[in-house]
Regions:
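Catalytic beta-strand/loop module used to bind and position nucleotide/cofactor moieties
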Residues: 4, 68-69, 76, 81-85, ...
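Anionic-ligand-binding alpha/beta catalytic cores of soluble enzymes and soluble regulatory domains
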Residues: 118-164
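Intrinsically disordered, low-complexity boundary segments flanking structured domains
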Residues: 22, 99, 156-160
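N-terminal glycine-/serine-/threonine-rich phosphate-binding loop
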Residues: 1-76
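Short, electropositive, low-hydrophobicity segments enriched in small/polar residues
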Residues: 13-15, 99, 142
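Active-site histidine-anchored catalytic micro-motif
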Residues: 27, 44-47, 51, 60-69, ...
Length: 164
């Protein structure tokens, strides 16, 4: 049994969540899909990071977590798959996973390189679904990507209280 979690900023009004689940089930009928949240504020990577960090440890080791928040592959933002704490995380390299790796060194991180093996009009979520299904069938990360040693540095706003 493979568990694949979904955390997105898609909301529930449109067809996007259902289409993503359909894509996963079309490739891997035995997958168990669990929604963590689809109500992340649009492009709010900090909120997504908080949700993933708070939720992932409630799932068994080997769970695959797809994070579809600010997930477009533009500029120097690449898609990544990371094995960390015996879980797998698939998302854009946009800072979402930075809080996790501050606590424990990742077992492996790859920059996903299968985009050219899929249809030219494939969506980012279809790539994430293909990677999740590959991993859920016991596939290795180095088959779907090139190993990288670190994530993109992203500055995070922090709050503080002062007497001013």
């Amino acid at each position: 049994m493979s568990i694949i979690t979904l955390t997105t900023d898609f909301g529930h009004k449109d067809y996007f969540v259902g289409a993503l689940k359909g894509k996963i089930l079309s490739e891997h009928k035995e997958a168990v899909i669990v929604d963590i949240s689809h109500e992340i504020d649009l492009f709010n990577t900090l909120e997504a990071s908080y949700c993933i960090e708070a939720a992932y440890h409630n799932f068994p080791k080997g769970t695959i977590h797809i994070i579809g928040v600010d997930s477009e592959r533009v500029g120097d933002t690449q898609h990544i798959a990371m094995q960390w704490d015996d879980h797998y995380f698939i998302c854009a390299d946009n800072g979402i996973l930075n809080t996790l790796i501050q606590k424990k060194i990742p077992q492996k991180i790859v920059a996903i390189t299968i985009h050219d093996r899929l249809n030219t009009d494939v969506s980012d979520m279809a790539v994430f679904a293909a990677v999740a299904c590959h991993i859920s069938r016991g596939g290795l990360l180095n088959v779907i990507g090139k190993e990288i040693k670190s994530l993109k540095e992203v500055s995070v706003l922090t709050s503080s209280i002062s007497d001013d």
